[in-house]
Amino acid sequence: YGVGRITKEQESISGDNYSVLCENGQFVFCLSDGMGSGIEANRESETVVELFEQFLRAGFPRIMAARMINSMLLLQPKEGMFSTFDVASINLYTGVCSFLKGGASPTFLRRDTWVEVVESTSLAAGLVSQTDFDTTTKKLYDGDYLVMMTDGVLDALPGDRTEQMKQLLLEVKNSEPREFARELLER
């Protein structure tokens, strides 16, 4: 896998965090974007990804872990604490990828000469007590690129942001994941 990061102008700390877990034939990537930007947003999203990883290691199913994190965010004394929640879990034997999204930006699946979009209509974790996270599955194949991002990346694009990102993804030439991510952010 490869990761590219960038912060908002005049910000030294990003409000985004991620976690990667690979065990029992599953590769799980969790991405969270805390409310706002800077250190407070960073702490919020860091809490989300760390708790999610701990719940998975303890044997909780992904959806249950997400619901417990949502409840925890609702119980925080600081009003208005919420974070997006974006999980892709790939079965390394079958190639089936399960998505779980809460208020998250679209995820893009690039395959050869086309790009598919996995979108979410649910709210971010910590906003309401009965959050219904969006779930779906897709089959991945050798050579596919799964691209997850927070809203800041899309917000930097003009016009129809989703269509712009699809076009940018098709233009990236690097095949190594880290270089792919770097090239995408440089565009």
Give, region by region, the residue ranges found by the protein language model.
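PP2C/PPM family metal-dependent serine/threonine protein phosphatase catalytic domain
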Residues: 1-15, 70-76, 105-137, 182-185
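N-terminal entry segment of metal-dependent catalytic domains or homologous docking segments
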Residues: 1-35, 40, 46-47, 133-136
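Short, glycine-/Ser/Thr-/acidic-enriched flexible segments
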Residues: 6-8, 25, 35-36, 92, ...
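Acidic loop->beta-strand submotif enriched in PP2C/PPM serine/threonine phosphatases
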Residues: 12-24, 85, 117-160
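Short hydrophobic-aromatic micro-motifs
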Residues: 27-30, 99-100, 146-149
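Active-site-proximal, acidic helix/loop segment immediately C-terminal to a metal-coordinating Asp/Glu
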Residues: 37-58, 140, 144-187
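Extended hydrophobic-aromatic, low-complexity segments
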Residues: 40-41, 98, 108-110, 116-119, ...
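Catalytic core of PPM/PP2C metal-dependent serine/threonine phosphatase domains
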Residues: 42-112, 179, 183-187
